Structure formats: structure tokens, C-alpha cells
């Protein structure tokens, strides 16, 4: 799922979305993640996704891929070594990878998580705090976790052109992140009106159906996305 630069000056940024195919039907995470969480398989699933992305991705420094990871994955003391080993077996540059941590998940060992993030960032990996603003953990995580991006929760973004409250929240979150040197990404952008407001607010990246719908990673084509963005700009 692509995140496009609102001011058209940043590199292309894509988020990997996980789907499970069963009898020709694509199942959304809401169908298979709860059982994985219940039986303790989420970390294993995260590692499988990382391995697959690292295997398929080639060096292109103008491309940044976001991979969602769970709090239990980040808590795991062996995660850092796993990433390094997987990296050595791939053609990936660390600068191409951004690990996304949802605010909605619990990071039990915050000190260990911070240490892991710092070590991986030193190598060039980047980190994003997802669903920013969705709960009470927002500002605590922003203070404690050394991230490069925050993704503003789509519930605030979706109708910001029709809601003064949403507009105020998005503007405040954007200013807070910017003041800390963190790049903002707006989720759930579904109309030109919302996109226009985000550009005025100076939000760096936008993600949503207005810009592009998710597609299989096998047909990732940067020129196609650039053409579509041009159509949105002129249409």
C-alpha cells in the first residue's frame, strides 16, 4: 500500500499489508491475527514477513518499505540478531526498511525495545509509530521510542475537511511530531479535499484509497504510481 509524498519531493514509501489466501479468498488480518496472537505465533509471523520482503526486495535507495511488527517481536532479545542475519542473506539496504510499531500494541519491555530500535537505526533501519493519536500511549511512546515517522490515526484524517475538531487534532499532532524532528504520515486519505488540507498543514506523506489502492507486491511499479499521482494532481 503506497504512501505518496504530499509535496512530491520525498522518496516513494510503501507499506506491506499481510493477507491470507484461503480457497481463492483473501482474508484480512482481523480474521487470522487474533488466533495467531492467542497461540503466540505473531512473532513467528512477523519474522516470516521480514524474510519474504528481504528476499524479494532489491537495492533501490529511492524505495522505502514499511513492515509492521508486533510489540512481542520488538520485545524479543533475539530480534536484532535475526534482522542482521536476514539482512546478510539478502540484497537489501537497511535504509530501504522501516519497521512500523502500532500504538495499539503493548511493548512490555520498553528499555529493551528502545535499545533494539537504537541499534537497528544505527545500521540505517528506520522506525514508525503507527496509529498515532489513537490512545493514551501516544505521547508516552513518542517520548520513549526513537522513531523516524509517526502515522496519524486515520480516524482523525478521514473527515478533517468536515470537522474542525479533527483538523485541530491533526494539526496539533503534526506540529508536535515536526517539533521533535519526526516526519508525519496521514492515513486514510480518501478525497482531494482531505489531501488539500494535508498539503496546507505541511504533512509530508499521505496514504489512502484516494491516492492508490493496495496491490500485490509482485506488480510494484514506481512509474505507474507516479503516473497516477500526476493524474490526481491534474484531474
Each language-model region and where it sits:
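EAL-family c-di-GMP phosphodiesterase catalytic domain
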Residues: 6, 10, 19-25, 70-77, ...
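Mobile late-domain/C-terminal helix-loop "cap" segments
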Residues: 115
Amino acid at each position: 500500500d503506497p504512501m505518496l509524498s504530499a509535496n512530491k519531493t520525498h522518496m516513494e514509501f510503501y507499506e506491506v499489508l499481510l493477507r491470507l489466501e484461503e480457497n481463492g479468498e483473501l482474508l484480512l488480518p482481523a480474521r487470522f491475527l487474533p488466533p495467531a496472537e492467542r497461540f503466540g505465533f505473531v512473532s513467528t509471523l512477523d519474522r516470516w514477513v521480514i524474510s519474504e520482503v528481504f528476499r524479494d526486495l532489491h537495492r533501490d535507495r529511492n524505495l522505502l518499505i514499511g513492515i509492521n511488527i508486533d510489540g512481542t517481536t520488538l520485545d524479543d532479545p533475539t530480534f536484532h540478531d535475526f534482522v542482521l542475519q536476514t539482512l546478510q542473506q539478502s540484497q537489501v539496504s537497511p535504509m530501504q526498511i522501516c519497521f512500523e510499531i502500532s500504538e495499539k500494541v503493548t511493548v512490555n519491555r520498553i528499555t529493551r525495545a528502545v535499545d533494539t530500535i537504537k541499534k537497528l537505526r544505527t545500521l540505517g533501519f528506520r522506525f514508525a509509530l503507527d496509529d498515532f493519536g489513537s490512545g493514551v500511549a501516544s505521547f508516552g511512546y513518542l517520548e520513549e521510542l526513537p522513531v523516524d515517522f509517526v502515522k496519524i490515526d486515520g480516524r482523525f484524517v478521514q473527515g478533517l475537511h468536515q470537522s474542525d475538531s479533527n483538523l485541530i487534532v491533526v494539526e496539533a499532532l503534526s506540529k508536535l511530531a515536526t517539533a521533535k524532528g519526526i516526519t508525519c504520515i496521514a492515513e486514510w486519505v480518501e478525497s482531494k479535499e482531505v489531501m488539500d488540507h494535508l498539503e496546507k498543514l505541511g504533512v509530508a506523506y499521505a496514504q489512502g484509497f484516494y491516492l492508490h489502492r493496495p496491490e500485490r507486491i509482485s506488480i510494484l511499479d514506481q512509474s505507474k504510481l507516479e503516473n497516477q499521482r500526476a493524474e490526481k494532481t491534474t484531474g
